């Protein structure tokens, strides 16, 4: 009969060297105030009135806990559920809670609509800077935020559609539930 091989952890781990030239994890810093090019561009392009809010947002985005949300949202990929447990077609995509937290923050801070709801000089600059800071944490959620932002000018070309959809599009409350749009036949 074969006898299991007894091995100690050091038997399979190579003893090489102690690395000394590695950087530390970049966290717990202000993504806005530490970015000289961004802070200068915001002022140059007329968004200086938003610098304080950008600084607060940059500090929040740069915390270790918040940066971890970005890693989690990428580590745990969305999962497609094509059918429910009874076999009915659902075609629902399920996202990790970290993704929803990132989306919630983006919506609450108006990354999806602030220049449309609070227009003025530099409004697009401040919104772009907020978006730039937030997508450094995780870029994937930037797509639905940007598509939502881009939808409103097009909808406003048809006032009856804008009247129907604009309140929901510009709302500062994130709703992670899946909704289906009305059928064209209804």
Each PLM stretch: what is its role?
Residues 2-120:
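Extended, charge-enriched "interface" segments that sit outside catalytic cores
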Residues 77, 83-175:
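Internal helix-loop-helix
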Residues 179-186:
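Conserved small/polar residues in nucleotide/adenosyl-binding loops
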């Amino acid at each position: 009969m074969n006898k299991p091989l007894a091995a100690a952890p050091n038997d399979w781990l190579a003893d090489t060297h102690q690395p000394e030239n590695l950087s530390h994890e970049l966290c717990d810093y202000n993504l806005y105030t530490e970015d000289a090019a961004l802070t200068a561009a915001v002022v140059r392009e007329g968004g200086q009135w938003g610098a304080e809010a950008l600084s607060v947002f940059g500090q929040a985005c740069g915390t270790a806990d918040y940066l971890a949300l970005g890693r989690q949202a990428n580590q745990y990929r969305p999962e497609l559920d094509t059918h429910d447990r009874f076999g009915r077609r659902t075609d629902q995509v399920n996202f990790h809670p970290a993704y929803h937290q990132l989306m919630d923050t983006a919506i609450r801070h108006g990354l999806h609509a602030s220049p449309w709801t609070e227009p003025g000089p530099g409004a697009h600059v401040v919104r772009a800077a907020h978006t730039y800071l937030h997508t450094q944490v995780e870029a994937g959620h930037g797509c639905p935020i940007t598509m939502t932002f881009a939808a409103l000018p097009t909808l406003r070309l048809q006032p009856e559609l804008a009247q129907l959809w604009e309140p929901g599009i510009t709302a500062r409350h994130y709703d992670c539930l899946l909704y289906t749009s009305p059928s064209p036949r209804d």
